């Protein structure tokens, strides 16, 4: 699959990713376009362009505002390992690259985008409980080749690929501060802001966190966990619940599904743990030297006097990994306390992995479970914006899925495989 476009008298060729030929160039592009989960990093390293200058204007405005503010800490994420890890779980997935240049020996990869078509729940009383939805992610354009329409060409070709495979809607995610990305998708391509999940993280301490007395925690086998989630998260009550939920729960990177129950049996909580340390590397940047020194001193003191149980945290200013919590549900008067105990249990599991420094969840802020998840402000981000587009505008849609907000009681499921 190849699409050739002439831009500013230079040939731009969009084609499928060739792992043997393109892997080094794509890895270098990812490093140059490092993405922040929050703060100014996302605005400075915006990774999209709209091809007609609108993004450039927004970018200039963002930079002007950024200069007036003091440098702040940002949580940055970099994909490691398999470049297709975030889409490979879908039966239909692709990675497209944009080549810039005319002469074969001088061509270089200047853009990349990933796309997949998956079957997920839409929520509500629909004729079909599951629909085919495309997910566009990982759009990167080389900083030295922006404002040339390369991002536009990549998105357009990715949408065409998804439509050809029966996708009814397309989704993408960015951050509120990434004005260029929002301008590209909501302006040129007609996406509408849709949902605002919140990233909630907590550092992994050197010491175990307590599980409340009277709370029993046990692990469910994958087949039992699938049956439990089928009752707790029916398709009509959840958005983006994957049709292959049993496969997700049985995946080798799902470390387990855990349930906590109270002594009286009137309340319970459940969550699953996903190991992302093999595919994602996070790092906190922009921290003051004094803070770095203080946390280093605290770690040294904790190593020398572990009986003090000081709340020391790993070195988060170097690349580290994370465990992701998904499928968080609770019920009963003691549900929040039980869910908090499960989060502590997940933290204690993470302590056994030296590569894991954070336990986190991506969850809708209006979900009651969000209030029960332990958080550290520096590891939280409420800037995420999900956008959606109907890929079949000619078909009448009586229930506009993009119309905000979702009805009360509808849960947003965030697939950890695509984080």
From Swiss-Prot:
| Residue span, N-acetyltransferase domain | 12-210
Expression across tissues is: Expressed in roots, leaf blades, leaf sheaths, shoot apical meristem and young panicles.
Any one GO CC term of the record:
nucleus
Reported EC number(s) for this entry are 2.3.1.-
Query: Where, per UniProt, does this protein localize?
Result: Nucleus
Biased-composition ranges, Basic residues, are 58-68
Any idea which UniProt keywords this protein has? Acyltransferase, Nucleus, Transferase, Ubl conjugation
UniProt region (Disordered), positions on chain: 44-68
Anything further noted? Over-expression of GWA6A enhances grain weight and yield by enlarging spikelet hulls via increasing cell number and accelerating grain filling, and increases global acetylation levels of histone H4.
Family membership noted in the UniProt record: Belongs to the acetyltransferase family.
Q: What is this protein called?
A: Acetyl transferase GW6a
What organism is the protein native to?
A: Oryza sativa subsp. japonica (Rice)
Q: What is the lineage of its organism?
A: Eukaryota, Viridiplantae, Streptophyta, Embryophyta, Tracheophyta
